[in-house]
């Protein structure tokens, strides 16, 4: 049986963003903010839609970058203009920056290593066994970890605490509907989204994991039932969707395992159906849904031809988000300046993300 959902956007009554895009679209630039947490000054960037009015409350999305990426580079290079979709749907966007350090084996071979503490890394094994192969590629160990072991590569800073403080600050400073905080991210940012949604599910209305999942044994069932969207490329060798070892020799939970843990003992968990929306119908993407008809469905979409990049993008501009905007260049001067995204470009992954959050607003 196939479930067909007709999702309608908030600002455009057509299924695809191309129907309401224009060559002269203009949006507000992002603003930079700082927050002190656990003795560290952390930065984040906020986008407000043009229609923003302090007399109204707006839904907000926390979006986290991937390994090596930046907050502003992810918006410009990875998603290639997610703020254009936030403008059309009327969402506040919040892009936090992870901690980072200079990695490299010599002074002339240095690079910025950014990462999120998505499982308190620094060990070789997880609850279900090894999380990397014997010959896995070695990553630079974040200095705060002390020792990372063979399989460790992610930050050991208190990112869960930072994100909780971030939500509190955003709620205090902006007209946010606190019942409609959503969290998402790409790659390592998706992994961190999984963790914060599990550790603080009461703060969110929905979750989307794009191109990233936690290691085996770290899947969870959130205390508060939340809708979940997963989008992964069928040819993604960095974070394979089927749980096999990555090209670098690291293991990540399969999308099926994440779904099973997320839904837990719910009887609806075993009732998995094909799923299609107006956006996915015209794309080469295959989706299923578990717990359809509830307020916490789990939609799992596989993009057969996709690799480790934002769904719908060609990847010609890169998918890492290493660059920074002018706004972030002072804090990360080693990074190149991003090329401004094309406001008329269309990406089904971005459209589906906002449709999902608009349709499934949690409890």
Mark where each language-model region is.
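Bacterial N-terminal signal peptides
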Residues: 8-15
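The feature captures the conserved acid-bearing segment of alpha/beta-hydrolase catalytic domains
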Residues: 87, 205-295, 299-308
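Cell-envelope and extracellular/periplasmic
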Residues: 64-69, 168-174, 186-193, 197-198, ...
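Serine-hydrolase catalytic machinery in alpha/beta-hydrolase-like enzymes
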Residues: 37-45, 55-182, 195, 199, ...
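Acidic glycine-/aspartate-rich tracts in secreted/extracellular proteins
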Residues: 51-52, 67-69, 99-102, 106, ...
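A domain-start/cap signature at the N-terminus of enzymes
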Residues: 20-60, 73-92, 155, 181-208, ...
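Alpha/beta-hydrolase-fold serine-hydrolase catalytic core, especially in secreted/extracellular enzymes
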Residues: 141-151, 263-363
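Bacterial N-terminal signal peptides that target proteins for export
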Residues: 1-7
